[in-house]
């Protein structure tokens, strides 16, 4: 082997050796910063290298920190890993909810405050569609799946009720408080049918605030109980961040 090639090989090897000697807390900071500034390609490459070097705990610690700090970028980071051939990293280093989301598995959306599962009414309300509300989690009509869409360096979701084959949207009109009622519709070419998720941690639970793209309002269940006994679903015109126990949703396998 020519001396120049030997020197080059030794140099490359030294770079990897130096990287392997970097303390985990520094590696965590570097990866965390890549995610927070939305440099997802860099975050994916760092994650792949860490995973190959058997340092998956670095990725797990970063994911936990992102969730604790309510960083929406955590969703984009996970989606890009999933999209770029690193589903194993999402399965091994993220909470199970992320795999359920990006694999488009059938799920239940469980409102933390009431322990009720989101579903759609049997009745159709005019041109708006089927009203969405909270129901006992054992109902067969509480099955949903999230369908990811990538646009402008951000991941959005269509939320499909698998029983009705209808999409979750917010109505155009509002109540006296400025809230938009949620419905299930067959199809809609509007940001009203797109949503984005913000992860949160409450006790030992991983939860998600679910925001509508059109109105930037979080999906919640009403505090008022209807005569039918249901709590209707609304896009809430108020602050929700910091109170996941009141306004966030759990994602469970159906």
Swiss-Prot record:
InterPro entries: Lipoprotein_11, Lipoprotein_11_N. Transmembrane segments: none annotated. This lipoprotein belongs to the group of structurally related '30 kDa proteins' that comprise major protein components of the fifth (and last) instar larvae and of pupae. This is Low molecular mass lipoprotein PBMHPC-19. Keywords: Lipoprotein, Secreted, Signal. Pfam families: Lipoprotein_11 (PF03260). It comes from the Eukaryota. One of its GO terms (cellular component) is extracellular region. Belongs to the 30 kDa lipoprotein family. Its main location: secreted. The keyword Signal applies. Residues 1-17 form the signal peptide. It is found in: Secreted.
């Amino acid at each position: 082997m020519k001396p120049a090639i030997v020197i080059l090989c030794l140099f490359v090897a030294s770079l990897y050796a130096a990287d392997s000697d970097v303390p985990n807390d520094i590696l965590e900071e570097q990866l965390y910063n890549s995610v927070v500034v939305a440099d997802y390609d860099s975050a994916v490459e760092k994650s792949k290298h860490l995973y190959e070097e058997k340092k998956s705990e670095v990725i797990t610690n970063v994911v936990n920190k992102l969730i604790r700090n309510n960083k929406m970028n955590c969703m984009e980071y996970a989606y890009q890993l999933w999209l770029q051939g690193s589903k194993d990293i999402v399965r091994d280093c993220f909470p199970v909810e992320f795999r359920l989301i990006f694999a488009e598995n059938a799920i239940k959306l469980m409102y933390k405050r009431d322990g009720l599962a989101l579903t759609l009414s049997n009745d159709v309300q005019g041109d708006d569609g089927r009203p969405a509300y909270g129901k006992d989690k054992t109902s067969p009509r509480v099955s949903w799946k999230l369908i990811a869409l990538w646009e402008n360096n951000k991941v959005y979701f269509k939320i499909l009720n698998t029983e009705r084959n209808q999409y979750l949207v917010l109505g155009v009109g509002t109540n006296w408080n400025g809230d938009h009622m949620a419905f299930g519709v067959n199809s809609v070419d509007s940001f009203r049918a797109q949503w984005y998720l913000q992860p949160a941690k409450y006790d030992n639970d991983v939860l998600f605030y679910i925001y509508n793209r059109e109105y930037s309002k979080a999906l919640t269940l009403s505090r008022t109980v209807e005569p039918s006994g249901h709590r209707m679903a609304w896009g809430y015109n108020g602050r929700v961040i910091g109170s996941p126990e009141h306004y966030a949703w759990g994602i469970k396998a159906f």
